[in-house]
Amino acid sequence: MICFDRLKKAFSNFLDKISGEENKKEPETRQTDQLESKKEETIQQQQNVQQPQAENKIEQKQEKISVQTGQENKQENKRSFFDFLKYKTIKEDDLNDVIEELRFQLLDSDVSYEVTEKILEDLKNNLIGKKVSRREEVEEIVINTLKKSITEILTKNQKTDLIEKIRSSGKKPFVIIFFGVNGVGKTTTIAKVVNMLKKNNLSTIIAASDTFRAAAQEQLAYHASKLEVQLIRGKYGADPASVAFDAISFAKSRNIDVVLIDTAGRMHIDSDLVEELKRVLRIAKPDFRILILDSLAGSDALEQARHFENNVGYDAVILTKVDADAKGGIALSLAYELKKPVVYMGVGQNYDDLIPFSPDWFVERIFSS
C-alpha cells in the first residue's frame, strides 16, 4: 500500500487548522443571535406592560410606531454585524503560525527547503486578501492551491516514455546504463525493467559491469535465469568497460533490441568509482542513463542525485521501495531542484512491481482520504 502518510498528514493538519480559524466565528454568531432575540422579547414585554388600557389611541399608535422603528434599527444593525462575522478577509497574521507548522512538517517529510518555500509562497499568495465565508470555501482554496503547486513542480520536466523512446530511436541495440549506490535495489530494478521490456516484445541482454562486488554478478545471474535473458559477465575485478563493450557487441550480432548495463555502486563520494563510470560511458556510449534512488534515504538520496548529476549526468530516475515510504517528499525535491523526471517506481519485490510515475497519481495519493 502506497500512502505517503507523513506528507498527507502535513497537508491535512494545515487544512484543519486554517479552516478551523473560520469555525471559531460560528459559535459567536449563534450566541449573538440568541442575545439579540432575548433583548427584543424583553423590550416587547416591557412595552406591553407599560401601556395602560385607558390611554388615548393616538398615544398607543405613536408608541407602537416608536417600538417598530427601534426594532427595525436593531435588525439593520444586527444584519451589519452578522455580515461582519460571516465574511472574513484572510490576513498574513492569520497564517503565520499554521504556515510555520506546515514548513516544519514538509521538511520532516523529505521535501527540500527550496520546494517547501515554493509551496508555502503559493499558499500565501492565494490565501492572503481572500474574503471567505465558510469552511468549505477555505478548504477548496487550500486544496486547489496545493494540488496546482505540486502538479506544476512534478510536470516541469518533459514526461519520458521509455518504451516509446526505445522504439522511436531507430537504434539497435538501444543502450541503457544504470547508476546507484549499494543498497538502493539497483539489481532488482534492472530485473524489473527487463521484465517490462519483454512484456513489450523487446529483446534484452544484461551487462554485469559491477565486477567489484562478487554478489552483484550472482544476483544478476539469478534474475537472468528466471527471466530467461542473456547475461554477459566478467571475472571478479575485470574491467567494467570491457564487459559493457562485449555485451553491446553480442547484442549487435544477435539483433537484440536493448542492452542494460549494471554498474558498481560503492559510495557516491568514491572518486575511483566516478572515474570508472566515466570510462564505461566513453566505451558504451549509452542512449539513456537512469539513476536508481532509494525513496527511504530522504535527503541523502537528493545528495546522491546531485553528485551523479555533477559527475556523470543522468536522464531520469527510478525510485525504489516506494511501497514502504511513509514520507513521499523526495519525488518533489528531485523534480524541482534537479529538473529530472521520475519515470518509474518500485512498489514491491515482484518483477511486475514497477509502475510508471504519474504526477496525477502522486497528487491523488496525497489528498486521498
Curated annotation (Swiss-Prot):
The gene is ftsY. It catalyses: GTP + H2O = GDP + phosphate + H(+). It is found in: Cell membrane; Cytoplasm. It comes from Sulfolobus acidocaldarius (strain ATCC 33909 / DSM 639 / JCM 8929 / NBRC 15157 / NCIMB 11770). This is Signal recognition particle receptor FtsY. Its main location: membrane. Residues 44-53 have a biased composition (Low complexity). It is a peripheral membrane protein. Its EC number is 3.6.5.4.
